[in-house]
Amino acid sequence: MHSRRGMKLCFMLVRRIPPVPSPVLVEACEILTRRGFHIDSGIAEDVYVQPDLLRPAHDLYLLKSHTELSLSLASILHAQGARMLNPYRSCITTQDKIMASQLFRAVGVPTPRCWVTGDLTLMHSVVEERPLIIKPYRGHRGAGISVVHNPDELAAVPPPETPVLTQEFIQGSGEDLKVYVVGEEVFAVRKEFSAMSFTQAGRPSQVSPEVRDIALRCGQVFGLGLYGLDIIESPTGPVVVDLNYFPGYKGVPRIAPIIADYIEGFALGRFELEPLDLTQSAEPPSEAMSLFAEQSVILVPELAGQERGDQ
């Protein structure tokens, strides 16, 4: 068990929109400072780092940022044994929407049907049957999301620079149910859905037993302790459309002391977090798909002769 006196915590932050400090995070850090923790923070994009010289210098890193640079630096620290909240492996799995969607399905979390591709023209036949939401596979803050209802709207979407996750559009009430979790405590706020809704606080909402169960199941599967979910309340029940580690907790009353308590407990080693190992328990779906099963033709003609010559 660690002693809090003099423990060094480092918050790996992201540039905020608007560019003002998070009141929740400021209050939580003030509480931790009064309890004897030393707090540092920084934004990866605002400094320069020589990767081969980077070494863990804090007792705990709190990964708040979702940017590629922050995740890369976190991976270097993780490889050298740095403790992180949330754990690095949990964050990297959560950030990858393709991996996350498969895990949701594997453990029975209700989530939309989805497809992945790097070529949106391949989704023509799918969008003819249903509206779709197109997301960068490692996006955050709603950046790069498009909603398309027909092939013409699909054709108007710029070609993606990275792979995309294409989700079946789920009709809801027009509001997001934002669910926030700290350990075993679950909170929720409602806000109108929009591309900039992540900047709005929303209004507090009751958490149903079903939503609470879904939220805690996600934390157990991904190994998360501080996280949030976007839920659509469909006619058939709640559906998870996104999962994020260390969200802003906007609109949750008196949340900063609860976050500070959780960070303190983790820093002092009172508990750990670990993603579930599903390799032994996962069962194949009833309708299985093999990767490239139908691709018997070499797709790059100029390589055909070279491959035959190498045999």
PLM region spans:
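A long amphipathic alpha-helix within ATP-dependent nucleotide-binding catalytic cores
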Residues: 195-240, 244, 252-284, 288-301, ...
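Extreme N-terminal starter segment of soluble prokaryotic enzymes
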Residues: 4-12
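Rossmann-like NAD(P)H-binding beta-loop-alpha module
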Residues: 112-132
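Phosphate-binding site of ATP-dependent enzymes
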Residues: 143-222
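Conserved N-proximal alpha/beta basic substrate-recognition cap immediately N-terminal to
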Residues: 15-113, 122
